[in-house]
Amino acid sequence: MTSPAPEPVSIDSVALAQALIRRPSVTPADEGAMDVLQRQLEALGFNCRRMKFGEIENLYARRGTERPNLCFAGHTDVVPVGDSAAWTQGPFEAEIQDGMLYGRGAVDMKSAIAAFVAAVSNLPRDLPGSLSFLITGDEEGVAEDGTVRVVQALAAEGEVIDHCIVGEPTSANLLGDMVKIGRRGSINAWIAVDGRQGHVAYPQRAANPIPVMVDILSRLQSRVLDEGYEGFQPSNLEVTTIDVGNTATNVIPASAKARINIRFNPAHQGKDLRAWIEQECRDAADGFSGRVEALCKIGGEAFLTQPGAFTDVIVAAVGDATGRVPELSTTGGTSDARFIRSLCPVVEFGLVGATMHAVDERVPVQEIRDLANIYQALIGRYFAAFA
């Protein structure tokens, strides 16, 4: 005797977004946000696995065993609220005022998670393939025990994800006007020059680190990294801090520190930029009696998901729901898509990002419902194209 079909469960995207926002999951805290999501996914028939690395909660949920496996990726952690007194609505109260849902994470990106869950709840369970969710609590922080660790674990287990959608707020001005198909890479460098402190009247008794630091930064900034790359902005280097810790007017400081960031397109690889930074530091230190050190950390490589059948599905789904034709873009900062790209083709699509990370972060309630409709159309078109 066959088991009766499970009762259909319809999930309201706005109500779920509110439930998630009410969990103050400021990175790296979870505060029960994963529990809220897991309960909803289990009600929809998903097999949920909690994957904890360090203190970070992660969730991989899958429904179905066949291919293709379409995955939605996102994060439940949020950035700090700043001055809570400056908010017109409590940052974790998830209040709706004048058709706007307020709260930290409303845009980035709890509402997108809720919209995709709602979309899945309105579709039949016997889709010709599998649906999965890869959700982390470590995207807004150091991002060392989140998506990158889950991806490594899934790859080691032989788990296959065929395509992935990351629900970051990619839309620029109107929902559906932009889809991200790639990102520039990122490398941070911490540069330290240690000299010898002394009196400014007796420079021969000191080793001033500042001229060496100025030379290093001048060398790095004088190079034009490139003029751009097909589909990408030019790479750019920015000095983000310089510090000598010296308030005296008659003292040569003992040390100078600086930090730089490079956002680079596919014309470069992180390892080559790291080698260049280290070499420029060595050259600037030639003849200096002190010590120069550069510590570089590659945050992610540049990547591009080539336009094709997968992006066509997303463009068509946006058109179905909004009548818009989205721009396929690689602008903006990094996201966890940089880790997922090693598993499968990945694109990013979500809400308008105008108020993300801001005081009074908010999203129109109707925009959440419209996003759920787009995701629902996307899922249907995906399995029609790839199953």
Swiss-Prot record:
Binding site for Zn(2+) 2: 108, 140, 357
Designated gene of the protein: dapE
Species whose genome carries this gene: Caulobacter sp. (strain K31)
UniProt KW keywords: Amino-acid biosynthesis, Cobalt, Diaminopimelate biosynthesis, Hydrolase, Lysine biosynthesis, Metal-binding, Zinc
GO molecular function: acetylornithine deacetylase activity; cobalt ion binding; succinyl-diaminopimelate desuccinylase activity; zinc ion binding
EC assignment: 3.5.1.18
Listed name of the protein: Succinyl-diaminopimelate desuccinylase
Subunit structure: Homodimer.
Catalyzed chemical reaction(s): N-succinyl-(2S,6S)-2,6-diaminopimelate + H2O = (2S,6S)-2,6-diaminopimelate + succinate
Pathway: Amino-acid biosynthesis; L-lysine biosynthesis via DAP pathway; LL-2,6-diaminopimelate from (S)-tetrahydrodipicolinate (succinylase route): step 3/3
Obligatory cofactor(s): Zn(2+); Co(2+)
